[in-house]
Swiss-Prot record:
Phylogenetic lineage: Eukaryota, Viridiplantae, Streptophyta, Embryophyta, Tracheophyta
GO molecular function: structural constituent of ribosome
Signal sequence interval, chain numbering: none
PANTHER family: SUPPRESSOR OF TY 5, TRANSCRIPTION ELONGATION FACTOR SPT5 HOMOLOG 2-RELATED
Gene3D superfamilies associated with the record: 2.30.30.30, NusG, N-terminal domain (3.30.70.940)
GO CC field: nucleus; ribosome
Compositionally biased residues, Acidic residues: 1-26, 65-82
Cited PROSITE patterns: RIBOSOMAL_L24 (PS01108)
Name used for this protein in its record: Putative transcription elongation factor SPT5 homolog 2
Entry's transmembrane regions: none
Family the UniProt entry places it in: Belongs to the SPT5 family.
All residue ranges annotated as the KOW domain in the record: 260-287, 412-439, 464-491, 588-615, 683-710, 936-963
GO biological process terms, semicolon-separated: regulation of DNA-templated transcription elongation; regulation of transcription by RNA polymerase II; transcription elongation-coupled chromatin remodeling; translation
Length: 989
């Protein structure tokens, strides 16, 4: 009637024998505890009884088993196994394991409570084991909850104690054969297994990412040498290196999670000439760890053609070719072999050039997954513009919009954000976010038929905005800017910036709704918005916009809106100096003064002056939306608001180039080019721009700030240097100090005379009535009419000219001279002028505003805006200027601004037929040459050379250096430096 079979009894007997052996094993331990052997003996006798009677009732078997459990539970030391922080409670044939701290012991239950618990009887069918485990865990956790909390804090500190110290074994770096790292580690392990404790090394480590080396853990270097002795894959003659203690923890680092690459995801290249370039994943081979990417090629077709022909230059190039789409037709023109092949793996057709595959201008390249960076790759809008392709409807669309938002930061979406689904079955579904989980986002949709809320993966969502919303850019190159959305194009937004008043294009995922208006980025490093800076190419400009990656600068090119985007490293320094200039009517203009532009492309605009440099004004016109309202123009093209509009004298004295002197003789000051020493620091060159001709600073130009004996101090654009005086040349005057015409042989140039300027009353033209033959009829000859063209022009320096009105100023005047009686010597008409600065014949008309009247000081100053005489040596350098058809000039009319025009013809009398307008589209007028002046050419403009050795040649301006222009001749392609005054701007019809 027993419910157990014989097999069950035999199995039970085997279990009892194992229990008996276990009790014998722990008997010494029980004696140490002072346990009584009476109860143990009773248990043994019971076991013998069971073995003696094999047939027992099911009830007796159950009772004996229960008693055994009672004894085992009571004997805490024998039945509680403590190993590695685990405590195991044994209940018959099953056990419960609890992970507890090593410092805490299991609680000693009250004996009465324990006895009462087991007297209820236990049977596997009467109570569920899971329920028993649950109640036991609750009892233990409740009693020691506080202790566990306190031990958690201790464990954090204990983790620091696990770091290696000087008492721990050392880590040694041993060099081995490449590719044999794992084999060396296995061989060392086999040695330890075979020979036991003979070797005293602890471990051997072979890392996958470290080739040619293995790590061996040992206490001493001698132990390592003994272990590696006789191994063929280890270089025994190489030095064994000790790993520093601080670097030991970094040796065994956890390998990062494998990157999950998918098609159409964006990556950046890490190696080669494509380093940093954006690429798109086309295919992924997870087995070989290789991917096929699509990127914009950087290929020099000419170098590729030379390589294929075998004429490649051995010299290595110092730069990588710029990214450019492949042009197959251009490659064929260079005789590069192009093959049209089909890829057997994908079935697509590619153009094969030298083993490289091209399609639609892109390069398809197979690379290793280790050579690309796929994490935190956020393409810029400009980069994605180049990867766009037309869709089935012919519209331009991105490949996969969801790939653009795969690298979002955590917490990107917030509750209440309007979103739209961009991928999956719910594509184009709009809604609002209610809750954000780890990866899924709960949204409430607009459609009533759908259940709310709906769980959608965060990668399938994008923020949604409507025109008119005020937003703030939270990421990207425009980060920090605010503005209003004016247009929504799919998931791209066009925003009107609050600061620049310009349209910027950003992704909808990069903005957030905001009512605040910020100024954006106004300072990066040492540079702030609207600073005047000098660039690396020595050009200057004003900062219009500051971004995290680039700086937008309006260059100082008058009447041209030349804007360049540079990096902060391309800026040399910032200009702090504030300069005052003069406007068209000689009114002083300073920073913050309001001026109005009266000529040029910006004519009619006005605003305050923000920066001034080299006669160029940077004006901010708040009504101008282009370039944040900034315009660039010359100071001579502006007038000061509220200033004097009276036309100044045509030849005013230049306060910078000449010293103000008395009419009488000043013995303390040396004249210009006369060799006089003068006072210390008092020289006519002070304040002028000079160029250094000799020495280590040869070729540098700057402003002369001080003269001291034979040395001068020149303020370069970068610093002030000291050079010898003979090593500089004046850049503000085109003529040289060599006396011209009949003055070359006079030594000294100005002979001694006492007094040099005699007293005369009246001072000029004493006794001349009428003055200068004013009543003569006709008044004067045609040769001396300043308004009558002369071919060739003549002046009073030609001694052989019978029509000359005067003699040499250094000869005694003969009777009948028109100049009146004066002591032989230099006329007192001017003071301290150079021999080349004697004026032409004075006009008898009074008053007169022509440049033929004597001036103080003498000579025609090169003041901007002053009409130059056709005979002036300043025009054309060493040769006279002859106007030719097809060049752009300025026509000066009385009471009007300078009007641009194009010379259509030059008449025999020297006058010009000019068509007004920048391209000659206006009316045609006739003007004399003294009413016409050249337009100064700018960089990259084509010019005609009007004087000098290359007169009549055409060239292209490639740069400016003060008063000189750097041109490239069209015929010989030579680079020449010529005066800007002989360069005429050509007009392209």
């Amino acid at each position: 009637m027993s419910q157990y079979s014989d097999d069950d009894y035999s199995h039970e007997d085997d279990s009892e024998m194992e229990d008996e052996d276990e009790e014998d094993e722990y008997e010494p331990r029980s004696s140490r505890k002072g346990r009584s052997g009476k109860k143990r003996g009773r248990s043994n006798s019971d076991s013998d009884g069971r073995r003696g009677s094999k047939k027992k009732s099911s009830g007796s078997a159950f009772i004996d088993w229960e008693v055994e459990v009672d004894d085992d539970v009571e004997d805490d030391d024998d039945d509680v196994d403590v190993e590695d922080g685990k405590q195991q409670l044994k209940f018959g044939d099953f056990s419960l394991c609890f992970i507890v701290s090593g410092e805490a012991d299991l609680p000693n239950e009250d004996s009465d409570h324990r006895r009462q618990y087991y007297q209820r009887g236990f049977h596997p069918h009467e109570e569920d084991v899971d329920e028993l485990e649950k109640r036991t865990l609750e009892r233990l956790s409740t009693k020691y909850a506080k202790d566990d909390y306190e031990l958690d804090d201790v464990n954090d500190v204990d983790q620091q104690a696990l770091l290696p110290s000087v008492r721990d074994p050392k880590l040694w770096l041993v060099k081995c054969a490449i590719g044999r790292e794992r084999e060396v580690a296995v061989c060392l392990m086999q040695k330890i297994v075979d020979r036991g404790s003979e070797f005293k090394i602890r471990s051997a480590i072979a890392l996958d990412h470290l080739q040619n080396y293995v790590y061996i853990e040992a206490d001493m270097e001698a132990h390592v040498k003994e272990a590696i002795k006789g191994m063929r894959n280890i270089y025994a003659n190489q030095k064994i290196l000790l790993v520093p203690i601080k670097e030991m923890t970094a040796v065994l680092s956890v390998e990062s999670k494998a990157i999950d690459l998918s098609r159409d995801s964006w990556v950046r290249m890490k190696l080669g000439i494509y380093k940093g370039d954006l690429a798109q994943v086309v295919d992924v081979d997870n087995v070989r760890k290789r991917v096929t990417v699509k990127l914009i090629p950087r290929i020099d077709l000419q170098a590729l053609a030379n390589k294929l022909e075998g004429t490649e230059n051995v010299k290595k190039k110092a730069f990588a070719p710029p990214p450019r789409f492949m042009n197959i037709d251009e490659a064929r023109e260079l005789h590069i072999r192009v093959e049209h092949r089909r890829d057997p793996m994908t079935g697509d057709y590619f153009e094969n050039i030298g083993g490289m595959l091209f399609k639609d201008g892109f390069l398809y390249k197979k690379v290793s997954t280790k050579s690309i960076a796929a994490q935190n790759v956020t393409p810029t809008f400009d980069e994605l513009e180049r990867f766009k392709r037309p869709n089935e409807n012919g519209e331009i669309d991105f490949v996969d919009e969801s790939t653009l938002f795969a690298n979002r930061k955590k917490g990107h979406f917030m509750k209440g954000d309007a979103v739209i689904v961009i991928k999956g079955d719910l594509k184009n579904l709009k809604g609002w976010i209610e809750k954000v989980d780890e990866e899924n986002v709960l949204i409430r949709s607009e459609m009533k038929d759908l259940p709310n809320p709906i769980a959608v993966n965060g990668r399938e969502l994008c923020k949604y905005f409507e025109p008119g919303n005020f937003v703030k850019v939270v990421s990207g190159i425009h980060e920090g800017g605010t503005g209003m959305i004016v247009k929504v194009d799919q998931h791209m937004l066009i925003i009107l910036s609050d600061t620049t008043k310009e349209h910027i294009c950003v992704f909808a995922d990069h903005v957030a709704k905001s009512a605040e208006v910020t100024k954006g980025v106004t300072k990066i490093g040492d540079y702030e918005l609207h600073d005047l800076v000098i660039l690396s190419d020595f050009s200057f400009g004003v900062i219009l916009k500051l971004d995290s990656e680039a700086i937008q600068i309006l260059k100082g090119v008058p009447d041209s809106s030349e804007v360049s985007i540079v990096k902060a490293s391309e800026i040399k320094y910032k200009i702090w100096k504030k300069i005052n200039v003069q406007d068209r009517y000689k009114n002083v203009v300073a920073v913050k003064d309001v001026v109005r532009v009266i000529e040029g492309p910006s004519k009619g605009k006005q605003g305050p002056v923000v920066q001034i440099y080299k006669g160029v004004l940077f004006i901010h016109d708040r009504h101008n939306l282009e370039h944040t309202g900034f315009i660039c123009t010359r100071c001579s093209s502006c007038v000061l608001a509220g200033g004097n509009f009276k036309t100044p004298a045509l030849v005013p004295p230049s306060p910078r180039r000449f010293q103000r002197a008395d009419m009488g003789y000043n013995p303390g000051a040396g004249g210009r080019h006369q060799g006089g020493r003068g006072r210390r620091g008092d020289d006519h060159l002070v304040g002028t721009y000079v160029k250094i001709r000799l020495g280590p600073f040869k070729g540098y130009s700057g402003r002369l700030v001080e003269v001291k004996d034979k040395l001068v101090r020149v303020e370069l654009e970068a610093k002030i240097v000291t050079v010898e005086r003979k090593a500089i040349s004046d850049m503000t005057d085109n003529v040289v100090a060599t006396p011209q015409y009949n003055m070359g042989s006079q030594t000294p140039m100005h002979p001694s005379r006492t007094p040099l300027h005699p007293c005369m009353t009246p001072m000029r033209h004493s006794g001349a009535t009428p003055i200068h033959d004013g009543m003569r009829t006709p008044m004067r000859g045609r040769a001396w009419n300043p308004y009558m063209p002369m071919s060739p022009p003549r002046d009073n320096w030609e001694d052989g000219n019978p029509g000359s009105w005067g003699t040499s100023p250094y000869e005694a005047a003969t009777p009948g001279s028109d100049w009146g009686s004066s002591t032989p010597g230099r006329s007192s008409y001017r003071d301290a002028g150079t021999p080349i600065n004697n004026a032409n014949a004075p006009s008898p008309m009074t008053p007169s505003s022509t440049s033929y009247l004597p001036t103080t000081p003498g000579g025609q100053a090169m003041t901007p805006g002053t009409d130059l005489d056709v005979m002036s040596l300043d025009i054309g350098g060493d040769a006279e200027t002859r106007f030719i058809p097809g060049i752009l000039v300025n026509v000066h009319k009385a009471g009007e601004d300078r009007n641009p025009g194009v010379i259509r013809d030059v008449l025999p009398d020297g006058s010009c037929v000019v068509a007004l307008g920048h391209r000659g589209e206006g009316e045609t007028i006739r003007a004399t040459q003294n009413k016409v002046s050249l337009v100064c050419p700018k960089k990259n403009e084509r010019v005609k050379i009007l004087g000098g050795k290359y007169c009549g040649s055409t060239a292209k301006v490639i740069g400016e250096d003060g008063q000189d222009g750097i041109v490239k001749l069209d015929e010989s392609l030579d680079i020449k430096i010529l005066k800007l005054t002989i360069l005429a701007k050509l007009v392209h019809e």
